[in-house]
UniProtKB/Swiss-Prot annotation:
Name used for this protein in its record: Movement and silencing protein TGBp1
Protein's organism: Lolium latent virus (isolate Lolium/USA/US1/-) (LoLV)
UniProt KW keywords: Host cytoplasm, Host-virus interaction, Inhibition of host innate immune response by virus, RNA-binding, Suppressor of RNA silencing, Transport, Viral immunoevasion, Viral movement protein
Any one Gene Ontology BP term: transport of virus in host, cell to cell
Residue span(s) of domain (+)RNA virus helicase C-terminal: 139-268
Primary location class: host cell
Extra remark: TGBp1, TGBp2 and TGBp3 seem to act together for cell-to-cell propagation. TGBp1 is the main movement protein that physically cross the plasmodesma with the viral genome. TGBp2 and TGBp3 would facilitate TGBp1 function.
Sequence ranges assigned to domain (+)RNA virus helicase ATP-binding in this UniProt record: 1-138
Description of how the protein assembles with itself and partners: Homodimer and homooligomer. Interacts with capsid protein. Interacts with host AGO1; this interaction targets the host protein for degradation, thereby suppressing the antiviral RNA silencing.
Amino acid sequence: MEDFFNCLRSRGFERTDEPLPSDSRRIVVHGVGGSGKTSLIEAFAIANEWVRAYTLTSHERFDISGRGISQYKGQPIDEKLWTILDEYGQTDNPETLPPFNVLATDPYQAFRCQPLRAHFVSLRSYRVPHHIAQAITQYTGFPIEAAGTDLHEGKYTVGPWTDKLRQQILVEDGEIHYQLSRRQCPHKLITDAIGEQWPTVTVVFDRSISPESARPLRCLFYIAATRSSNELNIRTYVPTRTPGLIKASLPHTSCRLCCRPRDLPSEN
């Protein structure tokens, strides 16, 4: 257990004043997107045969020997081994989970449940650039810091969704998802993007977001924004008076709303 704690400290995680459990079970670790939490868990599981690591997302991570992080689907855990569950925040009630030794998550991605009290935390992201971190806090009220002395500034833009949508596009499940799908515009649901990252992310919402917004909405915005390692584009969708239609002056084959692969700017 102390070895794991040392690994956390080496990655910038700080011990809180929450008392550790006496039975070494349900140690809670919270890290913001890009804090290195999942990479640390993966490396620790690979390096130690007595450790088993799981995730509640579909993003399994293995080395060539097959060790790493596997998806947890409710199967029994071996309590003789040291077990870690990543992304516990994706369950409806973490209190009902088996007695894992470690429960880890990004607390601001936990839109389904109230996060547990943490024993180790990190607010420093090695992925999210400085300006995007500032934008996330401005929109959500969630604290997140860009890590490192050589700060990568990054950039973010704000505008209507009639501005060109650059990949990767992330949206809620609903009207925006429907409209992009009928125009065959490549995009992902925000809930399917947990664990992913891209240089450029465009997030489209149909309402304004602020620290006063409902927590689930702020969590979804946070998930989308922390997927970006360079550029974040925030777009607002305004529906027309006619349900199911989008006001567009250009024909569908050249519609600026549709970022077909042939229209995408080069990443080079």
